[in-house]
Design a protein with these regions (language model features):
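Acidic, proline/glycine-rich low-complexity IDRs
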Residues: 57-63, 67-112
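Mature extracytoplasmic or otherwise solvent-exposed domains
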Residues: 1-22, 26, 75-80, 84-86, ...
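Long, charge-rich alpha-helical interaction segments
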Residues: 3-59
Length: 112
């Protein structure tokens, strides 16, 4: 594929990601909602520094996109990304998300 086509594909994927952040986080939360309770248990025990318990919204707002990889195979380009949390509600892990060429989102597991 020519360089302009590659750039267009990258721009398209990043634009989609910016427009669909909530969709990606929704899929992540389906498999990882328990982190909110785990962090709140740690806050209560004093093993996680926070001023007060967190809500699901606090957790969702802490998630940031990191390490985007785009695989270009003609029309069938796919991409993966890692979700990190600031503060570190994922306890040193990153949530790997996979997005196929039809923009179907799957949780690929935790890294780290």
């Amino acid at each position: 594929e020519d360089q302009d086509g590659v750039i267009d594909t990258v721009v398209e994927k990043i634009r989609w990601l910016n427009d669909n952040r909530d969709k990606v986080i929704d899929v992540f939360m389906e498999d990882n909602y328990q982190y909110v309770d785990a962090i709140n248990d740690m806050i209560e025990k004093g093993t996680f520094q926070a001023y007060e318990p967190i809500s699901e919204n606090d957790f969702r707002e802490a998630l940031v996109i990191d390490n985007v990889c785009i695989f270009i195979r003609g029309r069938n380009s796919e991409f993966t990304l890692d979700l990190d949390a600031q503060p570190d509600y994922l306890l040193g892990h990153l949530g790997n998300m996979e997005i196929d060429s039809q923009y179907e989102v799957e949780f690929g597991g935790l890294n780290g």
